[in-house]
Amino acid sequence: MAAEKPHMNLAVIGHIDHGKSTTVGRLLFETGTVPPHIIESFRKEAESKGKGSFEFAWVMDSLKEERERGITIDIAHKRFDTDKYYFTVVDCPGHRDFVKNMITGASQADAALLVVAAPDGVMEQTKEHVFLSRTLGINQLIIGINKMDAAKYDEKRYNEVKEQLSQLLKMVGYKPDDISFIPMSAFVGDNIAKKSENTPWYKGPTVLDALNALSEPEKPTNLPMRLPIQDVYSISGIGTVPVGRVETGIMKKGMKVSFMPANKEGEIKSIEMHHEEIPQALPGDNVGFNVRGIGKGDIRRGDVCGPSDVPPTVAEEFIAQVVVLHHPSALTVGYTPVFHCHTAQIACSFVELMKKLDPRTGQVKEENPTFLKTGDAAIVKIRPTQPMVIEKVKEIPQLGRFAVRDMGSTIAAGVCMDITPKQMR
């Protein structure tokens, strides 16, 4: 078995009906990910219906039918390989939990492919998704200007849309010069896997080339070690075994650690991954570890493990930048929904609405607004109702994002800008 290629999480973003699903379908199709037996069954069906020419469209329609019948395409379909990487397509926006997943790290994207339909250009969700990507720290972006077939492969139209997008990207803080813009048609297949003869004026990479050219995500090993606890087991003959994923830094055997906000200390006796003992664990590793000096009742899910000399930060209150994604009426001071941050779920109160921002530029629109509604971006002050670990997004981004949930849906998403720490010792 060859060594596993490096893995990348790819978010496919863009306005509704601009061709996100078709683009994903085309990438799966072109990389040989749609299983041959599925293609074969469509080919037969196409022939039986007298449609001799088997087209990619059939694959897409069938995937769409599966969705409509309520069968979600399992995740195996959503993985594809390029020469350099293997990609997982993380939930696309439109899924209710997309933002929650993106923020709480269930599927932190390493890069995003923004799909913009050439006939329409920049639309409302295009702006929203670009702003969100920036807020969430997605630094690598590829832009597919899609449906070029519908725009008659017109170079002038492509340049107009590219210019609109460049303005938008600059506004939120991306550098358009570092980004690939690709004229494409996911439906026809132009410039996805191979250069299209329909765009002789375009000299740049195909979408697959651009995906291959992304830089490998760096493991945040230089940051202080942080491991949010998912579960705690008590194993006879061994003792207390917390389980979780290392988010940052390196966990080593013999390390003195603190669990916050439990405020308990211990020493790591052993670390296990996939039932094998390992001397150290790196970011992304899911591990169980045994700690000397900690009882099962001392710590729980939502606590965070870190080195005793740089323990996880417990917030008395914190200042956050939030985007209100879906609130039935208006959000005011005193509102206390549940914040999902790493593995913790804690009710937190909005104690001050400091500034309302323009969600497309991040510029201040209004000081001390009286309320926030769906679509607003703002700087707010938050006070957790119980002790909670959160870090500044600039310092430890993996623990600086959160989603706000209430009544079964994601109300808002945000990042932590500043913290008033709670004195724990």
Curated annotation (Swiss-Prot):
Residues 14-21 are annotated as: G1. It catalyses: GTP + H2O = GDP + phosphate + H(+). GO terms for molecular function: GTP binding; GTPase activity; translation elongation factor activity. Residues 5-221 form the tr-type G domain. It is found in: Cytoplasm. Mg(2+) binds at residue 21. CDD domains: EF1_alpha, EF1_alpha_II, EF1_alpha_III. PROSITE patterns: G_TR_1 (PS00301), G_TR_2 (PS51722). It comes from the Archaea. Belongs to the TRAFAC class translation factor GTPase superfamily. Classic translation factor GTPase family. EF-Tu/EF-1A subfamily. GTP hydrolase that promotes the GTP-dependent binding of aminoacyl-tRNA to the A-site of ribosomes during protein biosynthesis. This is Elongation factor 1-alpha. It comes from Methanoculleus marisnigri (strain ATCC 35101 / DSM 1498 / JR1). The gene is tuf.
